[in-house]
């Protein structure tokens, strides 16, 4: 199997309940992650969808929607191994690459198999599947997610070769939050976003309410971000267009007209949309984490007192600060 696995930390299970002195509280979450394995996070039952690479791309995306999942491991029958992941990013890349106009059907989406798309997309730049063993530490998992700039990490049993679970930033942070009250609170948890400088505050990728979906897809491809704040003419955030919203084009079979505005494309969820989840630079890291976990979102939009966008704080930023850098800016 051509895969990249993260090596087990030598300290993976040395200490189930690390005893930190007050001076070393800043590393308490790092110690926790090093003392728990990926296996500890796997629920007793969860849905996992696997696609064979010979499946048609269109059917695969409809299956993602039907099953309510955002990604699926890809099984290559010829190689008898998992070779990659199919995600909403692939759907975006296909639409952006092949869309011509509302009058022309996207042949490649209708007819291509997953293996054909992978050959076109990867070409000569072969990327091995990044995965992890269930015995590896959660610290290794966080490191792998951030180092490889990925959002999903398959947990694959090295003996059977079976995919057991898919780890995400969201699931790891939720797991950490379950135990967070048992630890002495690190000093940095009471510091503000501004003090810690966590997040992205330069070259924020955004769209206007009138921006066509096709243009938004191009921004996703170019900037490699997972969401775009939607702003009015004064730069105030009024909505957010995420990669997950794009899969609705498949759900409603409206992917043949990408000239509509993001505002129109977002109308499908207006009946339950509670508004953009925001935060301020003066708010503490503890407040930010609580908001992210409780709302089960992947990022918060940082705004000023007028709701003008100042930055984005993602789950990746949070985990990097908590686990890899002990609250300090990397």
Curated annotation (Swiss-Prot):
Record region (Disordered): 1-26
Record bears the keyword Protease: no
GO terms under biological process: cellular response to glucose starvation; fatty acid biosynthetic process; positive regulation of gluconeogenesis; regulation of carbon utilization; regulation of glycolytic process
Residues given in the record as ATP 2 binding sites: 70, 152, 170, 242-245, 269, 277, 298-299
Any Pfam family matching the protein: CBS
Binding residues annotated for ATP 1, in chain numbering: 70, 85-90, 130, 151-152
UniProt keyword terms in alphabetical order: ATP-binding, CBS domain, Fatty acid biosynthesis, Fatty acid metabolism, Glycoprotein, Lipid biosynthesis, Lipid metabolism, Nucleotide-binding, Phosphoprotein, Repeat
UniProt-listed CDD domains: CBS_euAMPK_gamma-like_repeat1, CBS_euAMPK_gamma-like_repeat2
Residues engaged in binding AMP 3: 151, 200, 205, 226-227, 298, 314-317
InterPro entries in alphabetical order: AMPK_gamma/SDS23_families, CBS_dom, CBS_dom_sf
UniProt: AMP 1 binding residues: 85-90, 130, 151-152
Chain residues that bind ADP 2: 70, 170, 242-245, 269, 277, 298-299
GO cellular component: cytoplasm; cytosol; nucleotide-activated protein kinase complex; nucleus
Modification after translation: Phosphorylated by ULK1 and ULK2; leading to negatively regulate AMPK activity and suggesting the existence of a regulatory feedback loop between ULK1, ULK2 and AMPK. Glycosylated; O-GlcNAcylated by OGT, promoting the AMP-activated protein kinase (AMPK) activity.
UniProt modified residues of type Phosphoserine: 261, 270
Recorded domain comment: The AMPK pseudosubstrate motif resembles the sequence around sites phosphorylated on target proteins of AMPK, except the presence of a non-phosphorylatable residue in place of Ser. In the absence of AMP this pseudosubstrate sequence may bind to the active site groove on the alpha subunit (PRKAA1 or PRKAA2), preventing phosphorylation by the upstream activating kinase STK11/LKB1. The 4 CBS domains mediate binding to nucleotides. Of the 4 potential nucleotide-binding sites, 3 are occupied, designated as sites 1, 3, and 4 based on the CBS modules that provide the acidic residue for coordination with the 2'- and 3'-hydroxyl groups of the ribose of AMP. Of these, site 4 appears to be a structural site that retains a tightly held AMP molecule (AMP 3). The 2 remaining sites, 1 and 3, can bind either AMP, ADP or ATP. Site 1 (AMP, ADP or ATP 1) is the high-affinity binding site and likely accommodates AMP or ADP.
Function as written in the Swiss-Prot or TrEMBL entry: AMP/ATP-binding subunit of AMP-activated protein kinase (AMPK), an energy sensor protein kinase that plays a key role in regulating cellular energy metabolism. In response to reduction of intracellular ATP levels, AMPK activates energy-producing pathways and inhibits energy-consuming processes: inhibits protein, carbohydrate and lipid biosynthesis, as well as cell growth and proliferation. AMPK acts via direct phosphorylation of metabolic enzymes, and by longer-term effects via phosphorylation of transcription regulators.
Family stated for the protein in its record: Belongs to the 5'-AMP-activated protein kinase gamma subunit family.
PANTHER family the record matches: 5'-AMP-ACTIVATED PROTEIN KINASE SUBUNIT GAMMA-1, AMP-ACTIVATED PROTEIN KINASE, GAMMA REGULATORY SUBUNIT
Assembly: AMPK is a heterotrimer of an alpha catalytic subunit (PRKAA1 or PRKAA2), a beta (PRKAB1 or PRKAB2) and a gamma non-catalytic subunits (PRKAG1, PRKAG2 or PRKAG3). Interacts with FNIP1 and FNIP2.
Full protein name: 5'-AMP-activated protein kinase subunit gamma-1
Organism taxonomic ancestry: Eukaryota, Metazoa, Chordata, Craniata, Vertebrata
